[in-house]
């Protein structure tokens, strides 16, 4: 039965193709001029490329406009190796025991979530002394221990990360304005 249906489908398909190909006039779809079709009939309107063809034409035109601009300024292009070499993270060197300044962006009970500009943020406990001073948006000093807490568990072939950095909270970063105010109050 399946073979019988298949032959009927092929026969219907070939009949459709025969009708579609031989009884429709060729109009040169996708070309700007009708010269490829072999007829130069003035009554026949020019057909525009549609869908993908028109998008490809527009994209090609944009690329042609951009190419002269790119050739004129090769000095602005910097290689990845150069950007990596001059990045602040690479210039910093090993992260262990580096002093950085961060900003508290989230607080959950006594946990302070601090962003210091690294790949991950760090979580530190709120100090018991002057704990009320550590509010959201406060700038704090940190001593980095590790930029990424990772560990390889027993039998694992890859490291598992906690998506956090490890740092010790040293205190609030005093700005120049706050220091000058304290000096004026003491005098």
Swiss-Prot record:
The record's subcellular locations are: Mitochondrion
Task: List where the protein spans the membrane.
Answer: none
Tell me the keywords, alphabetical order.
Acetylation, Disease variant, Mitochondrion, Phosphoprotein, Primary mitochondrial disease, Ribonucleoprotein, Ribosomal protein, Transit peptide
Disulfide partners? none
Instruction: Please state the pathology the record ties to this protein.
Output: Combined oxidative phosphorylation deficiency 47: An autosomal recessive, multisystemic, mitochondrial disorder characterized by intrauterine growth retardation, swallowing difficulties with failure to thrive, hypoglycemia, dehydration, and hepatomegaly. Additional features include global developmental delay with impaired intellectual development and absent speech, microcephaly, facial dysmorphism, cataract, sensorineural deafness, skeletal features, and cryptorchidism.
Report quaternary structure and partners: Component of the mitochondrial small ribosomal subunit (mt-SSU). Mature mammalian 55S mitochondrial ribosomes consist of a small (28S) and a large (39S) subunit. The 28S small subunit contains a 12S ribosomal RNA (12S mt-rRNA) and 30 different proteins. The 39S large subunit contains a 16S rRNA (16S mt-rRNA), a copy of mitochondrial valine transfer RNA (mt-tRNA(Val)), which plays an integral structural role, and 52 different proteins.
Q: What is this protein called?
A: Small ribosomal subunit protein bS1m
This protein's species is: Homo sapiens
